[in-house]
Amino acid sequence: IIDPGLGFSKPGIEHNLPLLTGLETFRATGYPVLIGQSRKRFISAMLTGAGTAGADGPTMAQRDDVTAALSALSAEHGAWAVRVHDVAKSRAAVIAGNTWREYA
């Protein structure tokens, strides 16, 4: 299993989003890819537009909303699994994305 290590020593958007948008590169190795983006600081930075997260960032619930969106996008791009705190929210987002593709 490959885990790109989102957030570890990489607090900013500029270090984490390329790992997500480059998911196909990891998949090309033939190993399953695990995305562990749940509640990471870079999600706060995405919501505030600050580049890196500050102490007064979004709530965990707000981070969970973005985590769910990133889970759906990760699934769409072939992630084998995602690690999340709010399973129900991410599951619903992945189901919605899969349903969308069925009717596209």
Name every feature range the model reports, one short phrase each.
Residues 8-104:
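Active-site-adjacent loop and "lid" segments of alpha/beta metabolic enzymes
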